[in-house]
Amino acid sequence: MNHNMPECIARFTDILGQATMKTILGLASNGEGTADSLMEQYERGEISTDAFIDGIMQHAQRPTTREEIIAAWNAMHGGIPQERLQLIQSWKDAGHRLFLLSNNNDLHWQHILSLYDMSMFEYCFASHLLHMSKPDPRIYEAVDAQLKQKGCEGPFHFVDDILINRTTAEQLGWKTYATLDELNAVL
């Protein structure tokens, strides 16, 4: 999935102001969340969508609505290019078993489900439903255990553009790739 952080940050800066936006969403200069930020808590499913939105509304520098906050939040989702979806579908068509592990939250998850057919994946694992997020080794261990319990045998192939996420997965014996094209070359 592509992320459109500049658009999301611009919208939240308008709602919250620059300093408050960085504090509330826990954004470092690189756009990544910090461990105890409202954003990270939401991504791990530790707080509800209502609590997340209320937390933002409490610090808004101007009148705002829940709908405006949801639109700003979903602006982060930059879409999945059609060619990526076609490549993933081609793997399913070729008989490969596909699983999704995503750091996500309820608003983004519902947004994604409304836009894309996720039936290409046999199982989908989202951080907010597992109450953990990558790169915490526990999320990989939980997914690994659930897949093996369902009769899926490793080693699993894992695509993630973030090095620390791949490194943690490798420690469990997963084969990792930075891009879909890298994985496609070995399938």
Question: Each predicted region: which residue ranges?
Answer:
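Short, surface-exposed acidic
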Residues: 14-30, 61-72, 152-155
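Soluble or luminal CAZymes and related metallo-dependent hydrolases
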Residues: 48, 76-83, 135, 139
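Active-site neighborhood of HAD-like aspartate-dependent phosphohydrolases
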Residues: 1-31, 167, 171, 185
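Substrate-recognition element of Asp-dependent hydrolases with the DxDx(T/V) motif
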Residues: 65-113
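N-terminal alpha-helical segment
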Residues: 5, 33-35, 49, 105
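Asp-based, Mg2+/Mn2+-dependent phosphohydrolase catalytic module
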Residues: 92, 105-187
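A metal-dependent, Asp-based hydrolase signature
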Residues: 36-70
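Hydrophobic alpha-helical core bundles mediating ligand binding, dimerization, or RNAP-core interactions
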Residues: 8-12, 53-56, 73, 108-112
